Structure formats: structure tokens, C-alpha cells
Amino acid sequence: MERVASIMYLYPGNQEEYKKRHDELWPEMKEALKAHGAANYSIFLEEKTDTLFAYVEVEDKAIYDKIAETEICQKWWKYMAPIMKSNPNNSPVAVDLKEVFYLA
């Protein structure tokens, strides 16, 4: 498993809505994540800056990245775009993080 981490950014005032939408994550989106090899997926919020930290373990990063091509993922991005910084294609603005320490 490969560990993948990134940060994303909420627009101010959207912390509760972001959590609500993830509490109600569409079953089709859950299935797509699992089908693309995602496991142990967590998202944390730094409340003072509206910064999100996402961590996911993937079987194969290339396969995981293909989720972006799915209709359900693109629909999810469009649904989330009004509450977080997004790219022109509605994908979240995300900064990939480099792992600098790991303790098994």
C-alpha cells in the first residue's frame, strides 16, 4: 500500500457543511473509491485556517488517480466546488505532500 497525503482548502464558513456532506457521502462515491484501491481514507480539518489534510492508502496510485475520470467523481467535485477552492474542472485545489517520516 502506498500512503498518499494532501491538503485542500475550504471557503470560510463551510466547515459544518463540508462535514455534513461527507457524513452523507453518496454510496456510489464510496464504491468508486474502494474500486480504485482506496483504504483507510481520512480527512482532518484545521479549524482556524479552513485547511483540510487528507490521508489515504492506495494499492496503486495510477489506478487510484483514474477515479478522476469517473462520472461519479466529477459529479462529486461539482457538488463540492461551491464550498472549497476548486480548479476550473471542479476538482479540489490540492497540494500533494511529501512523506518525511514513517513509523510502522
From Swiss-Prot:
Q: Name one GO cellular component term.
A: cytoplasm
**Superkingdom of origin organism:** Bacteria
Pathway(s) where this gene product acts: Carbohydrate metabolism; L-rhamnose metabolism
Q: Where does substrate bind?
A: Y18, Y41, W76, W77
Residues at the active site: H22 (proton donor)
Stated role? Involved in the anomeric conversion of L-rhamnose.
* Family the UniProt entry places it in: Belongs to the rhamnose mutarotase family.
Name of protein = L-rhamnose mutarotase
Question: What organism is recorded for this protein?
Answer: Listeria innocua serovar 6a (strain ATCC BAA-680 / CLIP 11262)
